[in-house]
């Protein structure tokens, strides 16, 4: 992983075969980033993608091992159990330009992983909401 910083904005290059979520989470821990917005593009593989089933309060997961274009990565960083936690959704495209999208659990960089992280100076966190079954934003 490589990065450059300009104030509260970081340009982060996640390198080939590095796990995206693990790498970005560790970056936040190492740089004391507790709240942020993250976006990115690239080419990824070994993707664990999900969609939340609210009725059953569980994720329906799919694995994609092939190489896919990462056409959009959007996420946020908030504290969960006193640690930076990234919640991210992605859109991906295969070689026939067919797409998929959903909640990203993890993926590895296949070719490039180019991300912009903008630190936000707030005290947002995640707290468990029993009606949803997830740790949701708590901004009070």
Where are these regions (language model features)?
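N-terminal intrinsically disordered, cationic/polar leader segments
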Residues: 1-87, 91-140
